[in-house]
């Protein structure tokens, strides 16, 4: 254990975020720059930084804003993007990712941020933090720019598990509505189930079953179910929460990121074409800046792992300092709001409702004494 004064010692009021400094595409320097950016904006945040101490100490020492705000936890091993989750679960105890999660498990930190291997992070999170009672499959939720008044939709799952049956999709709806209530203060969010069309007869069998389950639970869980939605509705204003399986969601998010990158490049090329177009770009600078900010994926960098006993935020592996800072901000806000505890209560309530429904159904079913048979 090395570093400056521990965040908890420096100021007991600070919310402590545990950060895996390793595993990102750009290395620990970008992660340290990102937490320094967060520290300069937020005096109420402290950090536990996990990774090889000899690499991290000089990086932290160069950042004046981190003085007294960071404690370095020496972790010699690194989870790479090539490592299989099963291998990490067996042999990952000495890694920075394991160490970062352990700080949340022990109560030293209020949330964790990692840029590392998504599959390994989810596997270790389930191993060290455990799933909430009643949750079958955790999900990764992201904020997606949209035309809604709040400016974003929540979409899940975007890669935690490529499979999802009807019960899983119902749980995603419940967890997604809890997330958006806390992050955007929407008392009765609208939920859409992603499909190949909006008609009820379209889609796979599990989607049709999920449609019925979500419809049945909407009123009890205090959300509005708008039915099936299509890919074109993801950035629209029809729904606030988009529910899908991890395979479809991951393809959608990668497609969206690629399209945003193409749009930025096309606009830049168009305005650099001639002297007149450059003059037009100068005149439209304010509007173009707003557009660039609107579609900048770094602003919403960070997928939240829902369904765990703790707050885990997965930053994009290629995130720069701005992206890392955005992920830290998200972890801080969720920790400040006690989101993990609220989600646990919501899932427990949903499980109780399901059990009550099952009990009622059993009570209503005719027993042997009502069959009218005699021996």
From Swiss-Prot:
GO molecular function, one term: phosphate:acyl-[acyl carrier protein] acyltransferase activity
GO CC, any one term: cytoplasm
EC number: 2.3.1.274
Record-linked InterPro entries: FA_synthesis, Phospholipid_synth_PlsX-like
Bridged cysteine pairs (disulfide): none
Subcellular localization: Cytoplasm
Pfam families per the UniProt record, alphabetical: FA_synthesis (PF02504)
UniProt subunit comment: Homodimer. Probably interacts with PlsY.
Function: Catalyzes the reversible formation of acyl-phosphate (acyl-PO(4)) from acyl-[acyl-carrier-protein] (acyl-ACP). This enzyme utilizes acyl-ACP as fatty acyl donor, but not acyl-CoA.
Protein name: Phosphate acyltransferase
Organism: Ruegeria sp. (strain TM1040) (Silicibacter sp.)
Gene name as annotated: plsX
């Amino acid at each position: 254990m090395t570093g400056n004064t521990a965040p908890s010692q420096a100021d007991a009021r600070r919310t402590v975020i545990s950060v895996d400094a390793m595993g990102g595409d750009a290395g620990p320097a970008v992660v340290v720059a990102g937490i320094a950016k967060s520290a300069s904006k937020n005096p109420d945040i402290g950090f536990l930084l996990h990774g090889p101490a000899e690499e991290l100490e000089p990086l932290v020492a160069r950042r004046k804003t981190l003085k007294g705000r960071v404690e370095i936890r020496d972790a010699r091993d690194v989870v790479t993007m090539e490592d299989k989750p099963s291998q990490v679960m067996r042999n990952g105890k000495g890694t920075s990712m394991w160490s970062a999660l352990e700080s949340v498990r022990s109560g030293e930190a209020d949330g964790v941020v990692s840029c590392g291997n998504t599959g390994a992070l989810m596997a270790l999170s389930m191993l060290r933090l455990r799933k909430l009672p009643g949750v079958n499959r955790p999900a990764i939720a992201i904020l997606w720019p949209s035309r809604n008044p709040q400016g974003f939709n929540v979409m899940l799952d975007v890669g935690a598990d490529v499979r999802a049956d009807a019960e899983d999709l119902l749980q995603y709806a419940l967890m997604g509505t809890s997330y958006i209530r806390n992050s955007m203060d929407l008392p009765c969010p609208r939920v859409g189930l992603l499909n190949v069309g909006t008609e009820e007869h379209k889609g796979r069998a599990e989607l049709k079953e999920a449609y019925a389950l979500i419809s049945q639970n909407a009123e009890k869980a205090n959300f509005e179910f708008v039915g099936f939605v299509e890919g074109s509705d993801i950035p629209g204003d029809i729904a606030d929460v988009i529910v899908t399986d991890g395979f479809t969601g991951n393809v959608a998010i990668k497609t969206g990121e690629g399209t945003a990158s193409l749009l930025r490049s096309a606009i830049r090329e168009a305005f650099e074409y001639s002297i007149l177009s450059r003059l037009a770009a100068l005149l439209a600078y304010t509007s173009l800046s707003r557009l660039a900010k609107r579609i900048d994926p770094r602003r919403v960098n960070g997928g939240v792992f829902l369904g765990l006993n703790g707050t885990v935020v997965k930053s994009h592996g290629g995130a720069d300092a701005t992206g890392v800072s955005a992920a830290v901000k998200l972890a801080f806000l969720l920790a400040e709001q006690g989101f993990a505890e609220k989600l646990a209560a919501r899932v427990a309530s949903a499980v109780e409702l399901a059990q009550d429904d099952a009990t009622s159904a059993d009570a209503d079913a005719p027993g042997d004494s009502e069959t009218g048979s005699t021996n």
